[in-house]
A protein has these predicted regions:
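Glycine-/small-residue-enriched transmembrane alpha-helix faces in small-molecule transporters
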Residues: 1-69, 117, 176-203, 225-226, ...
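Hydrophobic transmembrane alpha-helices of multi-pass small-molecule transport proteins
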Residues: 20, 79, 101, 141, ...
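Loop-to-transmembrane-helix transition segments
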Residues: 36-45, 83-84, 89-116, 159, ...
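Specific transmembrane alpha-helical segments of multi-pass solute transporters/efflux pumps
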Residues: 47-55, 80-131, 141, 164-168, ...
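Helix-helix packing/entry segments at the starts of transmembrane helices
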Residues: 69-70, 108, 127-133, 200-225, ...
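C-terminal transmembrane-helix exit sites in multi-pass transporters
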Residues: 78-90, 135-157, 288-308
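Transmembrane alpha-helical segments that form core, pore/gating elements
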Residues: 79, 138-140, 159, 176-238, ...
Length: 348
């Protein structure tokens, strides 16, 4: 799902000011102590990294479209409960719902399904690696199509490195074709869908006054409707929960309730406490957890060029996002708490 993590605003976030040396100090999130955000940061990476394991387990008994439908329904119900507890509400403007229908298709329904199809053919850890290529799609679309970003030399170099990494992950020198290669293309296609959804959301949805929770809940509701319409024609009648093994039922519930619901709450807290810039770096940990979990839980193995390519991809993403040249702001001494940095959506 496309959720707030990097630089796109989906609601105003703030944090409490503290006292330093007898004066009121507005400690910026980027200066927050590690102990206040690191546990949630690692937990979020583990939750999103484990999603690829649960997809792999789920598609063993469910059609990818059915798995996605069940997952999205579980996630929507979870966020609706959180929405009710926090006394927030869904958007009411037809224009917002119209734009969210596009985000729901490209940020939820299609990519979730493509990852399911892909993991019928490739390892879960490899799907996790492909998920990290999303920023490589976001940048050219944001520059050329949606015109929400500007291409710089640094970004161009990062983009080139990233796509070099993609070729290494694919192992193009070994030949193109076969089910495994097609599965990788499906996973890359899923990441490409996120790449469409993120700049589209930034262009048409981010300026709305609704909270990130409200927009995400609406997004999942729309995606559930889209999938419910398509599923009978593509996958036939869905099996009853009693026809599924306990591990598949648990995987579906975990994907929806934990991977979407709880993960969203954790992510919003990470942004509030640590700042959007720090919270966005969870992108680099997700494939690491995906690989570790796939190796331990499913005894999966990678070819040598796949982790090497993944490192090149992550390096390219880091260069394009200016991670190596980023400077943290200093604490501001004064009265009142400034608004936290805005957040950009990321895919899981």
């Amino acid at each position: 799902m496309v959720v707030a993590t990097v630089s796109e605003s989906r609601g105003t976030l703030s944090y409490d000011s503290g006292r330093v040396s007898g004066v009121t100090a507005d400690i910026t999130p980027d200066k927050a102590p590690l102990r206040t955000w690191l546990p949630g940061f690692v937990a979020l990476a583990a939750i999103w990294g484990s999603s690829f394991l649960f997809i792999k387990v789920g598609v063993a008994e469910l059609h990818p479209v059915q798995l996605t439908l069940y997952r999205v329904v579980a996630g929507a119900l979870t966020l609706l409960v959180v929405l009710a507890v926090l006394r927030d509400r869904l958007p009411r403007e037809p224009r917002v719902w119209a734009h969210l229908s596009v985000v729901a298709a490209f940020g939820v329904a299609v990519p979730f399904t493509l990852f399911g199809y892909g993991e019928q053919r490739v390892e879960s850890m490899l799907a996790g690696i492909w998920n990290a290529t999303t920023p490589l799609i976001v940048l050219p679309l944001a520059v050329l199509v949606f015109r929400t970003e500007r291409l710089t030399v640094r970004r161009a170099v990062g983009l080139g490195l990233g796509f070099l990494g993609v070729l290494v992950v694919l192992g193009v020198w070994e030949g193109i074709g076969g089910a495994h290669f097609i599965g990788q293309l499906m996973c890359f296609g899923a990441a490409a869908c996120y790449g469409v959804a993120i700049p589209y959301q930034k262009r048409f949805v981010a300026a709305s006054a609704h909270s990130g929770l409200s927009l995400s809940a609406a997004q999942l509701l729309i995606a559930a409707l889209q999938l419910a319409i398509v599923a009978p024609f593509v996958a036939g009648a869905p099996p009853l929960p009693t026809d599924l093994s306990p591990k598949v039922v648990a995987s579906v519930l975990t994907l929806g309730a934990l991977g979407t619901g709880l993960a969203f709450v954790i992510n919003m807290r990470n942004i509030r406490v640590a700042g959007a810039s720090t919270a966005s770096t969870v992108t680099y940990l997700i494939p690491i957890f995906a690989v570790l979990i796939g190796a331990v839980a499913l005894d999966e193995r990678l070819n040598w060029h796949q982790p090497v390519g993944a490192l090149i991809v992550l390096l390219g993403v880091a260069v394009s996002q200016g991670v190596f040249g980023r400077r943290r702001p200093r604490p501001v001494i004064g009265v009142g708490a400034p608004a936290a940095p805005a957040a950009e959506p990321a895919s899981r």
